[in-house]
């Protein structure tokens, strides 16, 4: 049986992965845009919010760490269905726990399910997206991440509207959870099986043990860690914005209720625009040059967000922040996938490093902010994005002689 997709199958596969990226962004913005409401409903301080985020972050890291084994055993298709349903249930529990039960434990359980599901999904959908990019032969991974950002833009907009209309978090989150579950089921039937999409022909298929060996081997390669530094700084900046930009706007600067969701939306718009149109720029100027320019933009934007004396300047800072943090993660994933023979293993390893920062960083910021203030804490992000820019040379494309040689078939 040939492992070749028809044009129609490929288009449906690509559309399904676009939709999955969008749903992931939508789910994160649903939580992030309602953090002030959840905090008020449960009467939490920043450290307690940070503790809830820590529960989500730990669960996410567990999900990320186990996802390569799941992909090796069952393929991404089934794994993505299960994990999307998990975080759909999780985001619904967060809403119910915040306003219906007024229970921190229920919210924490919801965030753990949400974190585990989203963490696992992030690795799987990026493995699928890099496989699509390899088949297309051009830089398209930023466009997939643009759909994630588009999901956060729309999610933040819905969150701002819900906050303005004083819609309870329970109603808002339940509707979003149901929508995500529908997307998961529809996409399951559009994503091809592992054998059709990603595996070699039956005679060349690897055992599960061989797949795990290749996956673990990526962790012994220095380039994986250098790419990880690039991704870590930008992922920390993106995750910090998703979870703290709303509170930084409303409580750090003291602006009106609802302006936090607006700042998150502005950040997400900046990120989305660059991800949509950034691919051709990368193909023309190269990954390294683009990453260095964006690191300067991110550092400048975060500084302006922290120091801006009025709302318009703070929003300009949020936009620059989003623009600068836009391509660090997807270009890191593309760099990890330069060698098709080891793409899945290296993408999984790089994604793990990036998502540890993306999901584990915000709780750390929360705890630190209790001692030095939220806006002062964001200076940490400036240092991290500068480090990301300095290490961006690791993302240069591999030469042909640096790639794994294709196996020769015996006659």
Task: Indicate where each model-derived feature is located.
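Hydrophobic core of transmembrane alpha-helices in multi-pass small-molecule transporters
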Residues: 22, 102-121, 313-326
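Short amphipathic helix-loop junctions that connect adjacent transmembrane helices
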Residues: 33-47, 243-259
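Helix-to-loop junctions at the C-terminal end of transmembrane segments
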Residues: 63-76, 163, 274-287, 369-370
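Primarily marks hydrophobic transmembrane alpha-helices of the MFS/SLC 12-helix fold
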Residues: 77-80, 84, 107, 291
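C-terminal ends and interior cores of transmembrane alpha-helices
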Residues: 85-101, 297-309
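Intracellular juxtamembrane helix-capping segments at the cytosolic ends
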Residues: 119-134, 326-341
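Symmetry-related core transmembrane helices of the 12-TM Major Facilitator Superfamily/SLC fold
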Residues: 170-189, 376-395
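C-terminal transmembrane helical hairpin of 12-TM major facilitator-type secondary transporters
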Residues: 285-332
